[in-house]
Amino acid sequence: MSFPKGFFWGGAVAANQVEGAWNVDGKGPSVADVATYKPNTDVKDYKSHVAMDDAHIAAAMADPDDTYYPKRRGIDFYHHYKEDLALFAEMGFTMLRVSIAWTRIFPTGEEAQPNEKGLQFYSDLFAEMHKNGIEPLVTLSHYEMPLALATKYNGWVDRRVIDCFAKFCHVCFERYKDQVKYWLTFNEVDSVIRHPFTTAGIIPSRVPEDKMLETCYQALHHQLVASAMVVKDCHDIIPGSKVGCMLTKLTTYARTCAPDDELATQAKNLENLFYADVHVWGEYPRLILKMFERKGIHVEMLPEDAATLKAGCVDFVSCSYYMTMTESVDPNAERTPGNTVLGVKNPYLPSTDWGWQIDPKGLRYSLIELYDRYRKPLMVVENGMGAKDVVEADGSIHDPYRVEYFRQHISEMGKAIDEGVEMWGYTTWAPIDLISASTNQMSKRYGFIYVDQDDMGNGTLDRSRKDSFYWYKKVIASNGEELD
């Protein structure tokens, strides 16, 4: 197993899950700031956790507290980033994926001028990253947008949001052109279908149920057009820049070799891949357009959109990978949740406490599939497992389950490289404990670094190294050769 020289090793976080300081230095409210922690809701009931309507938004904005709105506080990375970057550097990180909070730069999304304090924060962050030998990989939209655009326009459903986003991105490219080379446009762009408010600011209660799917695809189209526009803008402003797309890689297996199961599985995989298809090839696959037609889905596309998509193709493909799915036409097949998706349970795979099935070989399968399809360099920019960690009396945190998870996944990633897949880097989700995207929990811990904070926001916020911290440090130092 041989990882290439210069391979990027690191971790990934999102502004809305780590920064906190939700109303500090001119930042406006984002859709993430009204996401609620629901302690009495089953953690596997993802649909209930991501539900949203106007009444909920109004109640949230009337409540200045952050107790039940954990993304308002995050882990206070806004004030702790130097400490955290020093820990990442100690592990040997050569890349850190972060996102820029749109509402730090344009609080409502429609200001004439950007917020200088917000711009300066990221200038300082990127400078500190370079000081620590860490290359920034920056996501421009990671599960947040100005709440004002969601309530005024129903988010990305309205085409006017494209120009708001393009302006935000243009400002970022101009400001950080000497600090950031690697960019991603939208995080898990496919997830608008699964959680429309989180991903695209769509308030579901405003949309008739029989029009919800069409509405999601309309918002998605606007995001795809916006992505193409900003890819071209980035290339124009930053010579040598590399801009990628990012999808949730949900490879689906057939439960049986029955032809009906195989056909259902094929449909799932085509759906999962089409989001990257548009980013890479600059056009919608014919099979997807026919699917729209069969389902009576009308997506309004302007005549000039085709040329825009063609002119803004990405340089590389990135993905999150947590699990695989299984498909069956049998309505009685046992099902299991995971990553906001309900699928058929795979009897050959173990599961996390949150129902996510663990499949290291599925990562290898997925990377080979992606590279064979696109012939573009790949990055895995999210991979990890949420678990409940225990702090021992002496302060130590033993997490052999996390080490084993990463050992197996990194091993399979290395095998994919040996088989010919071109990969640029790997950033784990997440290198430090943070607020969960779906359930808004703190107790669902991903990090190599423990953060002393509970689900209700109690704790010192002190950082401490888990056993996995030292293990990943060894992996990076050996460029992936030492996994024991």
Could you tell me what each predicted segment is?
Residues 1-65, 89, 108-110, 119-484:
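Active-site region of glycoside hydrolase catalytic domains
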Residues 74-86, 107, 118:
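Internal amphipathic alpha-helical repeat/solenoid segments
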